């Protein structure tokens, strides 16, 4: 209790609130949008990736390597579960097929560890990008580019991501919040942050 008073918040509660966020849904009668606080519930001791998540026609839930190929122009949300797609043969993940409608890209912890390049260029509807901890952590000389994403508002990278990547470019995005965790881009030689939408 003293720590909460001293720091002004409970770090655990703050982290939980941050993970919960708001789920926005459209009312069936067309009366508008309703915002609900919601979170995927699990049983105690059960990882989120063990829970069967239901996907709709516009959501891609990546649970294994084969799911990476399930993208098309109708995908609006991509969620990658914890610890998946860590085959050393997966060095690049091309998301261009869903560049026009993708609104949200959320990676769980410790996934896509051998990917060397992630380019999100010209994603006109993209609003939120979240990388969990330890993503892209077993590849060297990698490139992360996020550019010309005018609708992008939130970009978060968890601790220990892209450790040995050499380039991080973010330009011409409408980003309001950028959060980079500890130990990310440790060996980065080229870092560019530019905005044409100020």
What are these model-derived regions, one by one?
Residues 13-82:
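N-terminal capping/linker segments that flank leucine-rich repeat
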Residues 3-5, 14, 60, 76-80, ...:
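Well-ordered beta-strand segments characteristic of repetitive beta-sheet solenoids
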Residues 1, 75, 90, 102, ...:
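Conserved hydrophobic position(s) of the canonical leucine-rich repeat
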Residues 8-9, 29, 33, 86, ...:
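Intrinsically disordered, low-complexity segments
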Residues 79-86, 107-112, 122-125, 131-136, ...:
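Concave beta-strand-loop units of leucine-rich repeat
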Residues 12-13, 33, 37, 149, ...:
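Serine/proline-rich low-complexity intrinsically disordered segments, especially terminal tails, linkers
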Residues 1-34, 178-181, 188-198:
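Leucine-rich solenoid repeat scaffolds
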Residues 54-117, 121-123:
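LRR N-terminal entry segment and analogous cap-like coil->beta motifs
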């Amino acid at each position: 209790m003293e720590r909460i008073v001293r720091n002004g918040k409970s770090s655990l509660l703050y982290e939980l609130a941050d993970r919960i966020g708001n789920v926005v849904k459209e009312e069936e009668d067309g009366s508008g949008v309703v915002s609900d606080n919601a979170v995927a519930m699990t049983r105690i001791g059960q990882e989120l990736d063990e829970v069967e998540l239901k996907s709709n026609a516009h959501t891609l839930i990546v649970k294994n390597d084969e799911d990476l190929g399930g993208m098309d122009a109708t995908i609006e949300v991509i969620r990658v579960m914890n610890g998946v797609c860590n085959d050393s043969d997966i060095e690049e993940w091309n998301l261009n097929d869903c560049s026009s409608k993708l609104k949200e890209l959320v990676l769980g912890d410790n996934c896509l560890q051998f990917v060397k390049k992630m380019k999100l260029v010209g994603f006109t509807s993209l609003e939120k990008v979240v990388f969990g901890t330890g993503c892209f952590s077993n590849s060297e000389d990698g490139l992360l580019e996020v550019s010309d994403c005018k609708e992008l508002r939130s970009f978060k990278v968890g601790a220990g991501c892209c450790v040995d990547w050499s380039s991080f470019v973010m330009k011409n995005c409408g980003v309001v919040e950028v959060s980079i965790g500890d130990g990310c881009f440790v060996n980065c030689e080229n870092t560019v942050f530019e905005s044409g939408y100020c």
